Amino acid sequence: MADKTLTGLTVEESEELHKHVIDGTRIFGAIAIVAHFLAYVYSPWLH
């Protein structure tokens, strides 16, 4: 049996989960940057 931590995940599983969380955060950030840019460009009250 693999060595489990308090979370019930192995080190490999937690590293894989961390990679997905970081990737999701980067994608969310990129979408947010594009959305804020478009809101600035197309919203006359922001100029």
Swiss-Prot record:
PROSITE patterns: ANTENNA_COMP_BETA
Any one GO biological process: photosynthesis, light reaction
Disulfide bonds: none
Residue ranges, Periplasmic side: 43-47
Membrane-topology annotation of the record: Single-pass type II membrane protein
Spans within the Cytoplasmic topological domain: 2-19
Domain of life of the native organism: Bacteria
One GO CC term on file: plasma membrane light-harvesting complex
GO MF entry, a single one: bacteriochlorophyll binding
Primary localization: membrane
Location in or out of the cell: Cell inner membrane
Residues where a bacteriochlorophyll binds: 18, 36
Sequence intervals crossing the membrane: 20-42
Function: Antenna complexes are light-harvesting systems, which transfer the excitation energy to the reaction centers.
Assembly and binders: The core complex is formed by different alpha and beta chains, binding bacteriochlorophyll molecules, and arranged most probably in tetrameric structures disposed around the reaction center. The non-pigmented gamma chains may constitute additional components.
Name of the featured protein: Light-harvesting protein B-800-850 beta chain A
Organism from which the protein derives: Rhodopseudomonas palustris (strain ATCC BAA-98 / CGA009)
